[in-house]
Amino acid sequence: MRLITEMYSHQIKAVEKLKRIKIGAAYMEMGTGKTRVALELINIRLQKDRIDHVIWLCPCSVKENLKRDIIKHTGEEQECITICGIETLSSSIKANSYLLDLVKNKRCYLIVDESNLVKNHKAKRSQNIIRLAEYCTYKLILNGTPVTKNEADLFTQWYILDWRVLGYKSYWSFAANHLEYDDKGKIRRCLNVDYLVEKIGPYSYQVKKEECLDLPPKTYEKVYYELTNEQYEHYLNVADELMFSLNEFNPWTIYRMLIALQDVISGMLVNTSKDNIQTSPYFDNPLDNPRIKTLMELLDGLEEKTIIFCKYQSEIDDITNIINSKYGKDTAVPFTGDLTQKKRQNNLDLFQTTSQYLVANKQCGAYGLNLQFCSYIIFYSNDWNYGTRSQAEDRVHRIGQTENVHIVDICAADTLDERILKCLDKKENLVDSIREEIEKNKDKEDKLYSWITKKDWRKRKYSLKIKNKDKEDLYENL
């Protein structure tokens, strides 16, 4: 293997530390070039005849991008590197058998890219990767940070490398020493964290962007709009129906309410009369949706290439169709998991050349893409996952970015949208926040209600009471 790109100083430091050990972790924030570090380590092992093949596991959505990155750094495809999607190992017998045969018959270097995807010790993908790792002497995990939620994330990732680093052969022994649970089975806090830091320190290299890159800043803007009167009334009705069925012991009731309210905000008519929420378009013409109107006003006169992140497939379809109808075919191209890998790559190529807008969902577009030629992001709709939000932002805020990155959030005033953005700003989990509110305000209807709307619950309840009375009863009250 011949590497044709130069390394930055922070990448050289990473290689200098990790080349001396057989297993290791490169915790390098998105955009700092961890792929280049991994390729340098591979090259060193190959030259010293310690390995003869590489199994590189990564999210399925970034396989093609990883191939192109490897070609960018080496000048050609590398037959000694087998790339496989992490998610594939959850279900594909063929892929698992093929990789198992490889590790049994070759000296394989196992690389787990975006290793936070294997933090669940019970998951099939994690168990299958652990089985592969048993046959590999050289192993490397790549991720932005050691922990995305809490220190429990560390166990499986480091068990894949070598259980002896942390010193626990099972998750239960790890949990007994480091995790404290509440009476609902939820991790309350992590214990003896200093021990874990001390154990992984000799095998880890960690760097943040601000420590190593002179990148231009990110600027943020929130653009507010209001639901139509009828739409907001529907929002409040759905809140009325679902608010007091909430149960902090049953996360399903919380997710059900969040999903239903976000559906309404998105522009859907929501029926909550059955267990499964049923939706249909609220507006006959998508252009009547005030959220889409707000987006189109933002795009009017915008010349920069722009990524538009959406939560729902229906939003992506509507936005792509509306933009292309107004500005011409392929002005906007979609990027979702529903498309084939070939079609996704074709749309990325169009976005890099002639198309102005990439309309994507975060689950597909947040991982592994290098889009630093773009400097404008619009979050048309958000979910409550800070991890994928951060990943999405850093698709453009990375090595090679020379422009200020401007990020816009579209927000429906006085709705759950505002709460979601507050939780993202604070890096909080929305479901956990709601659980806390339920626990604190069990007997305070108005407090709990104000969590998802700024309307006064007491006035709302009185107006509903009046609304539901017939005229004779109303006259009696008056």
Which role fits each region the language model picked out?
Residues 1-27:
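Conserved pre-motif I regulatory segment
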Residues 35-40, 50-70, 148-153, 311-313:
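Conserved Walker A/P-loop ATP-binding site and its immediately adjacent core
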Residues 52-53, 72, 109, 126-211, ...:
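Conserved P-loop NTPase motor "coupling/switch" region that bridges the ATPase
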Residues 79-93, 350-367:
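Conserved two-lobed SF2 helicase motor
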